[in-house]
């Protein structure tokens, strides 16, 4: 469960290292975000000499959460950390590589570009 003020790792090579969630998109007073949800975040740590800088406000899609994700067939997926992929206004990733396994639910939510870049789909 991701809520405002939650710190996230970045799972791509966009140039950001750490994010902090400041808003969850989708409803006016939505409290938590799960895998596949879009959040507004601020960059807390960035790689030098890249397009993204510290304290820049961006959009990101959640790809890993510590909270368990239960599927309809009974399988439970749980990751060790909270992570996101930086996206642009159209929903395409800003990075060209993704470093972690991605849940199958992202394909159903039309993040097909992120799924195609991922090394493994769980």
UniProtKB/Swiss-Prot annotation:
Keywords: Chloroplast, Plastid, Ribonucleoprotein, Ribosomal protein, RNA-binding, rRNA-binding. One of its GO terms (molecular function) is structural constituent of ribosome. Its main location: plastid. The keyword Plastid applies. One of its GO terms (biological process) is translation. SUPFAM superfamilies: Ribosomal protein L14. It is found in: Plastid, Chloroplast. Pfam families: Ribosomal_L14. It comes from the Eukaryota. The keyword Plastid applies. GO terms for cellular component: chloroplast; cytosolic large ribosomal subunit. Part of the 50S ribosomal subunit. HAMAP family: Ribosomal_uL14. Belongs to the universal ribosomal protein uL14 family. Binds to 23S rRNA. This is Large ribosomal subunit protein uL14c. It comes from Phaseolus vulgaris.
């Amino acid at each position: 469960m991701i809520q405002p003020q939650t710190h996230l790792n970045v799972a791509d090579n966009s140039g950001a290292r750490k994010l902090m969630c400041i808003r969850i998109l989708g409803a006016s007073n939505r409290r938590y975000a799960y895998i596949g949800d879009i959040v507004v975040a601020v960059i807390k740590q960035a790689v030098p000499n890249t397009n993204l800088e510290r304290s820049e406000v961006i959009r990101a899609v959640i790809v890993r959460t510590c909270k368990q994700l239960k599927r309809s067939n009974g399988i439970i997926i749980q990751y060790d950390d909270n992570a996101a992929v930086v996206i642009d206004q159209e929903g395409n990733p800003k990075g060209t590589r993704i470093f972690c396994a991605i849940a199958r639910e992202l394909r159903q939510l039309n993040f097909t570009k992120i799924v195609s870049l991922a090394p493994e789909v769980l």
